[in-house]
């Protein structure tokens, strides 16, 4: 199996990752794949794509089985300071982190700690219900499939300001409970009945993270470190900037004006 991984600077912070430890993948010194024969074309394509889409920095790895067969770094991690992307650059992965969030929850499912059709209110410290359909329970399956009816209200979803000083529990209760400071029945929920329609929801994914905390009785980042990152030797993957020793290694996110 051939796996091609792209990491590039993004505008939102959720999880960071970089090239894994040397024990995780073996570098294939022979590089006897067709990609090496077409390397110049691949580089030309990547650079043209970066120009077209105004991508400041980019890393590419091609993995075959457990071997890194090709990797290269392009552009800048920090344009203002003229810092180039290198093998130690940490990238903000944005919604790719939902694969980790989902994995964390499903690990707990495999331990028979809940059922996918369970009402999430059985496990939360506060109640969540759709204002138009209060008698229809929101289930784990709905959260994982983005059919919960919970909507993203971007006016109260800060994601540019680094690590939040607000606990996940507090933020979500303010967003989802009727007496919460961030609650708005019209904008925080869709018009659809829970389970009826797909609506991509970052708040729903955050709620999955809170459920991991409540069921595992561990902070979400601690659970992921102990049960996902450490076992997989993802030694440079983090949920918080405060966990990173050298912040200069983080590719600065940019946004088009």
Feature locations, PLM:
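Extracytoplasmic/periplasmic, Sec-exported soluble proteins
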Residues: 34-41, 54, 85-88, 92-100, ...
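Active-site SXXK
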Residues: 40-46, 60, 66, 90-120, ...
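Short, glycine/proline-biased beta-turn/loop segments that scaffold the active-site neighborhood
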Residues: 116-131, 231-232
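Short, surface-exposed loop or secondary-structure junction motifs
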Residues: 78, 132-257
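Short, conserved catalytic-motif segment at the N-terminal edge
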Residues: 31-91, 115, 181-189
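Acidic/histidine-rich, surface-exposed loop or edge segments in extracytoplasmic proteins
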Residues: 20-31
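Bacterial Sec-dependent signal peptides at the C-terminal "C-region" and cleavage site
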Residues: 4-14
